[in-house]
A protein has these predicted regions:
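Predominantly soluble domains enriched in secretory-pathway, periplasmic, or organellar proteins
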Residues: 24-543, 547, 585, 610, ...
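The canonical Cys-X-X-Cys-His
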Residues: 70, 620-626, 772, 778-788, ...
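Detector for the c-type heme attachment site
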Residues: 75, 358, 626-628, 777, ...
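C-terminal capping alpha-helices of c-type cytochrome domains
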Residues: 137, 737-759, 808, 835-864
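Extracellular/periplasmic metallocenter environments
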Residues: 539, 601-662, 861
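N-terminal edge beta-strand
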Residues: 542-572
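Gly/Gly-Pro-rich "capping" loops immediately C-terminal to redox-active cysteine motifs
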Residues: 635-641, 773, 783-816, 821, ...
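Electrostatic cytochrome c docking/interface patches
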Residues: 645-649, 653-665, 755-777, 864
Length: 864
């Protein structure tokens, strides 16, 4: 299908350019000429462009490197969607600042130390039968040997676990085909205990290994007590992949430094880079994780280190669960083919890719045909007899990802700055493309799963150099999108990454992920359960227990309740905040001056903040997320008084009050305004009821939100009436103003519901009508004309029925408004609105499309 579309795009462009050479230069050509763009550039732009409201085909999750976060963007547009706070505090989301997210971050403390940064490398998606299912994402922290769990229901980090025996883990996260375990492999060997041993004890005491973190899918949590590790020799283990299909149950981990070199550049010895590369080969670790999972159940097969179960090398070897195969020196990536038979190893210092054959490996193991053992007693298989074959690719082969076609694979060449497409079954190179510059990881869509999709490939490059506007010596990273849908790879787009060095990407079809757009009211987003501090409207309160103060607060457009909080200096304050909105994307933020506090509350979410009121004074708090026209008024005061002080209060002058007559006029004015607003609201509710809004869940949620807001008006009306009956007109006006606030919130949700309902039930727009709507909006027409209402200009419903030869008349009027000003009808319109339509310099094509848009409006006139 994509090849067909590719061909059609070329044909369309060819026809376009052929036609236009005989005509005046089109705006399309003018733009290309002005910007120096080729037809190939224009085609690339078409392939990645998403009009407003159109979503991408794929999500891509990228390890954020030094940022300690995970970046999410869409493909093919490459538009960034979110930075997920993982190992590093992230203030916009309140991650690491409110109590609930801080608990997650503090799970990552190591030996009593707060660790507030991470080096995120390899995100991995949860799998079902080797296929991505879109439920969870896992990512490792190389610097501090940690794994995080991200719940894709909310796109938030829900757990961090610290490796109990390793100090650095690069080979994570890697997932078994049904997400039974998350594998995390040691990088730099150390003693597995936390004790000191000199470097001279390297061979005897230092060890590597792999940790199997047991994952409970129902709980969405790693179960530390059910997890275990396998001890490896102190070779420096690198990346891992899990078997699938015929190789299900097995895992494969690369390593370097089979020389067991320990450095010493400061003593005049060769550096690590030289000492670790002397030998011609290193070792691929091959181990049966299903057998290991059975072995660990018997405590005789384990030793306990730092409270964690570890299977020693000798136990794994004795039970036929661990083997080594030589591989070309200093390998990096290891990747199992979608069917599980082929294992592709990347050699950084070798121009060849090595393809191992799982069937051959199994036969050698079954026949116990080994060429020897290493220093630690692990059987070694013959490299040549294990190989399916080798292919010469180029310099600096680092990583691989699989394409949709049988046998297709794409590899990154760091030194050559290239992506190479080749066939691992036929052992031949198919295509190469240059990138910019020095590619590291590589990700074709779902290219590491059992069901690769092809379509696009992302090159995660290490250098950007001259690709973007200069921003000083520290450059952004460059992720490049490549079209792999045809026989030849095509570079489409460069994307600057401004925060951290991205490592591995994990991609998945957007149709597989279904995030929530709101929480069940009172949810703790980090646990997915109802928060102990859940507070509904009307339940707001302040409770004191000794020097502990508990505040139960709500946030809704456009106020925080309570708005005045008075505590004593030295009080321990706990504040529970609930966003009681239901409308999608109505997020509220919360901060208090001087307290180093910030939290983000999505609709329905409850969170907790704790602080000690240890300084006297008055501290404003407010909503940090712009949420309504009266956002700035969404604030309050924390007042901290010293209980040991005697304050002398100065009576402030009262503001000059309005006269009784002026108050009465003001009261009647706002009553009239509220009655008019209420008529609009009732018309909206009537429209929604008549059009059976309940059939559309998103519309229904908006209407529920609108009715919730409207239901609060009755109480305010009672307060207003009571105040008025007591001749307290000032308070009556205040309560009527509160009624207006609730009406505005009601109308906001109801109008959004109406617009969404119209888009759901209206007749589909033609392509011309869609373009006409864009031209109408971008040409400034919507500044004066509101469809279905008289605004600064007339309502345009039925505009094509107001004149003879209406389409021609409207076209002429848009083209040259002044030419119609003399007509009697237009003279009256100009006099009524006191405006003349300016010439918007619309093209003939835009005018034609706008008329098609007007036709669509008339077809659906009863909806406006």
């Amino acid at each position: 299908m994509k090849n067909f579309l590719h061909t059609v795009c070329y044909l369309m462009l060819g026809v376009l350019f052929a036609t236009q050479t005989a005509l005046a230069e089109s705006p399309f050509q003018e733009i290309m000429k002005k910007r120096g763009l080729s037809e190939e550039d224009a085609l690339a732009a078409l392939k990645v462009y998403n009009p407003s409201g159109k979503h991408d085909e794929y999500y891509v999750f990228v390890g954020g490197g030094q940022s300690g976060q995970v970046l999410v963007y869409g493909v093919p547009s490459m538009r960034p969607l979110k930075y997920i706070g993982v190992f590093t505090p992230e203030p916009w989301q309140g991650y690491g600042f409110d109590v609930d997210s801080k608990k997650i971050l503090r799970e990552g403390n190591i030996r009593g130390r707060e660790i507030n940064w991470g080096d995120t490398h390899h995100p991995a998606l949860s799998e079902t039968n080797g296929r991505y299912d879109g439920d969870f994402l896992f990512v490792n922290d190389k610097a501090n040997a940690r794994i995080a769990v991200i719940d894709l229901k909310y796109f938030e980090t829900s757990q961090i676990v610290v490796n109990p025996i390793f100090k650095s883990t690069h080979g994570g996260a890697f997932i078994t085909p049904n997400t039974e375990y998350i594998l995390d492999t040691c990088q730099y060997a150390t003693p597995l205990t936390n004790e000191y041993y000199p470097i001279e004890a390297y061979q005897d005491v230092y060890r590597g290994g792999v940790t199997f973190w047991k994952f409970d899918r129902k709980k969405g949590k790693i179960q530390k007590e059910e997890s275990f590790s396998l001890e490896f020799p102190p070779y420096m283990q690198d990346l891992t992949d899990l078997g699938k299909g015929v190789s299900d149950g097995w895992a494969f981990t690369n390593s370097f430094n089979s020389e067991l070199y320990t450095g010493g550049i400061e003593e005049g010895l060769p550096p690590f880079e030289a000492g670790c590369s002397r030998s011609d080969t290193d070792f691929l670790h091959v181990y049966n994780w299903k057998k290991l999972a059975q072995l660990v159940k018997d405590e005789k097969n384990t030793k306990i280190i730092n409270g964690h179960r570890v299977i020693p090398i000798e136990v794994a070897v004795k039970n036929g669960a661990l083997f080594l195969i030589p591989e070309n020196k200093s390998p990096h990536g290891v990747d199992v083919s979608p069917d599980g038979r082929h294992i592709i190893v990347s050699g950084k210092l070798d121009t060849h890719a090595s393809v191992y054959d799982f069937n051959k490996i199994m036969k050698l193991i079954q026949d116990k045909e080994f060429v020897g053992k290493d220093l630690y007693g692990i059987p070694i298989l013959d490299m040549k007899k294990s190989l399916y074959g080798q292919v010469e690719l180029g310099l600096g082969h680092l990583h691989n990802t699989f394409g949709k076609e049988d046998g297709s694979i794409y590899s990154s060449l760091y030194v050559d700055s290239q992506v190479v497409k080749w066939d691992y079954k036929k052992l031949k190179v198919i295509d190469k493309i240059g990138i910019h510059y020095n590619i590291g990881h590589i990700e074709a869509m779902e290219g590491k799963s059992a069901d690769p999709q092809g379509d696009y490939l992302v090159a995660l490059n290490k250098l950007a150099i001259d690709r973007f506007l200069p921003v000083g010596p520290l450059h952004p990273q460059n992720n490049q999108l490549i079209d792999i849908s045809g026989n030849k790879m095509k570079l489409l787009l460069d994307m600057p990454i401004p925060l951290g060095e991205p490592h591995q990407g994990a991609s998945i079809r957007a149709s597989k992920i279904h995030p929530e757009v709101r929480f069940i009211m009172g949810t703790n987003s980090r646990t997915g359960k109802i928060h102990v501090g859940k507070t509904l409207a009307g339940e707001e309160r302040i409770e004191r227990k000794g020097n502990k103060v508990y505040i139960y607060a709500t946030m809704v457009r456009s106020h925080i309740n309570p708005e005045r909080i008075t505590v004593n200096k030295g009080d321990n304050v706990t504040m529970y905040l609930t966003n009681v909105e239901r409308a999608q994307d109505e997020t509220h933020g919360f901060t208090i001056d001087h307290q180093n506090i910030h939290t983000s509350l999505e609709p329905g979410e409850t969170t907790q903040i704790d602080f000690v009121a240890d300084i006297e004074g008055v501290f404003p708090y407010y909503c940090t997320e712009f949420c309504s026209a009266l956002h700035i008024e969404m604030m309050g005061y924390l007042l901290v008084k010293d209980p040991n002080k005697n304050y002398e209060w100065i009576q402030k002058l009262k503001m000059k009050s309005l006269s009784a007559k002026e108050l009465e006029l003001e009261y009647k004015k706002i009553i009239a305004s509220n009655e008019a607003t209420d008529k609009v609201i009732q018309s909206l509710f009537l429209f929604l009821e008549e059009k059976n809004y309940t059939k559309y869940i998103t519309v229904k949620n908006l209407v529920t939100d609108a009715k919730d807001q409207y239901a609060k008006i009755d109480l305010e009306r009672e307060k207003s009436a009571k105040a008025y009956s007591q001749n307290n007109i000032e308070n009556a006006i205040l309560f009527e103003n509160m009624i207006w606030q609730y009406m505005i919130k009601t109308a906001d949700s109801a109008i959004r519901a109406k617009d969404l309902l119209i888009s759901s039930i209206a007749t589909p727009k033609s392509q011309a009508a869609k373009k006409g709507e864009i031209a109408f909006r971008e040409g400034g027409c919507s500044g004066c004309h509101v469809i279905g209402k008289i605004s600064s200009g007339p309502d345009l419903i039925g505009v094509l029925k107001r004149h003879r030869n209406a389409e021609q008349w409207v076209a002429e009027y848009i083209k040259d408004p002044q030419s119609k000003f003399h007509e009697p009808f237009m003279k009256k319109m100009i006099e009524f609105f006191n405006l003349k339509m300016p010439n918007q310099n619309m093209s003939d094509k835009e005018i034609k499309d706008i008329i098609e848009y007007f036709k669509w409006i008339d077809e659906n006139a009863d909806l406006f």
